[in-house]
Amino acid sequence: MYALLLMLILADGAALPGTWKGRISDLKCGAMVDTACNRRCIEEGQQAVLVEDETGEIRPINNTDFVKKYAGAHVEVQGSSKDGQINVRVVKPLDK
């Protein structure tokens, strides 16, 4: 029953809730996280991304303005994911 429900949700393209840990970067710099550069690029209009700790995957963040003050920081984000992009609802800075 749960498997069927999950298949229907995924087939519909619904956003799935989740929690991810990583560093906030920007689309131009990607996995090359540099706080000053990331801040500058995001201020200039680049989309924010999360570089995941475990996989190194670069996940675009839909609501860049919500996370821009954390550029270059190691964070845990909570939100939802759809089509590989994260819509962040909560940001928790992590120890360096």
Placement of each model-derived feature along the sequence:
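Conserved RNA-binding domains used in RNP assembly and mRNA/RNA metabolism
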Residues: 12-96
